[in-house]
Amino acid sequence: MQPTVTIKRLGWLAAATIVLGVLIGVGAGLLTLLLYGVEHVLLGYIEGPELPGPFGVPAARRAISVTVGLSIAGIIWYLMRHKTTAVPSVKKAVAGKRMPFWQTIAHVVLQIFIVGSGASIGREVAPRELGAMLAQRFCDLFHIEGVDGIDRRMVVAVAAGAGLGGVYDAPLAGMFFAVEILLVDVTIEKVAFGLGMSAIAAFVAVAIKGHHLFYDITAMQPESTPTLMLFALICGAACGVGGALFRKGSQWAEAHKPTGKAILWQMPLAGLITGLVATVVPQVMGNGRAAAQLGFSTFIPETAGTAGAMQSASSAAASPWNLLTGGGNVSDSASGGGAGSGMASFWAMLQGGNGPSGSVMNAGFPLSQSNIWMLLGVLALTFVAKALVTLMTIRSGASGGVLQPGIALGSTLGAMLGLVWILMFPTDSVTACALIGAASLLSASQQAPLMAMCLVMELSEAPITFFVPVGMAVATSSLISKWLLSRK
């Protein structure tokens, strides 16, 4: 039943859009600053376009940070889940479940804290939960319910989406998250309400935390090609399978979280294992930004001229391929030796050499066709490590999201397929293939093609012409994953 449109109703919708948009934007901006603060204190660096991951942080500090972070969070979550009112999921909040105020605040802060310490899990659930909780209080204050609670559900869902839009400066993705995943109902009213609130939240959040390019895809070809359209179908099919498996895995991990005191040892153990893995694969840490950028930064100079792709010096310096081996100015804030030494030694072992030569750009990881199988190996290692460590973190009892881990898996899988693809079709770039993979695997794992496509395109600020191949891949992956997930 559609609600009746009245001046009074449009008035409170407009008021909710502005008031909640501003409040959620402030919250999203502050949560981002909190993340930066935790990273600075525990890891000695702050993520950004110039440094997408803790590559310049000594291996021992990586391991200690994530172990301590998950240990502290495990204790607090145990007390919260057994001594206070539990915090429901956003979907349950939309359905009417009450979100306790202080418990939700603590729950949200803990999620940001563990991501900042290096835990392999997404941070996007925190601003969504904050938005949903604020929306419930707004509805209580102004007695907003509607017929059978339809207005209240809409406000809570749209506010949760605005949290996503605010924290990532992605208003389209925030709107589609609300109408495609939470409400599963697309109307002009919901789209307008959702887009308005997400846009305001994004604007306010950017005013607090600043605007920074989240994913650097400057090594991508300038235009789409017919062969890239064909790649989109192939990559979409592969990512449909991968996304379905990741969705099943994350659902299994969520369903088997410890319910008692086991969280007190499982979360510290997950932190220790993450830290040990990060000594060799530092890009596994955090919400997935570093792992995803590894795929986006895979640049093969031999085919670049044919594809029309170019990589600037600043982009190459910030490339994980360079940072993994200590090339360039990795970090001014992370003191001590061992920057990237784990992966550098691993690469030297594969080559049978003595590791990177120092500050020469990409010294240990020469990005060329002659080393394509080595590059595939590192991408495959990143893909497997990120998937397993993320599922382990969820299984141990941690709360958080899987959007950014899904993008990371899609980017690395797309880059792997792209490395093989450009041998046959050098007019395409690996970065474009990684972009297609990121959107299509996220779509498959979330069963939300519009949200996934918009989130990846907004985070990367990709040229609008790439909506066509990305859309084709997303459609393919969504259909295949839907079929796989429907099978018993």
What are these regions (language model features)?
Residues 1-488:
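Alpha-helical transmembrane segments and immediately membrane-proximal extracytoplasmic
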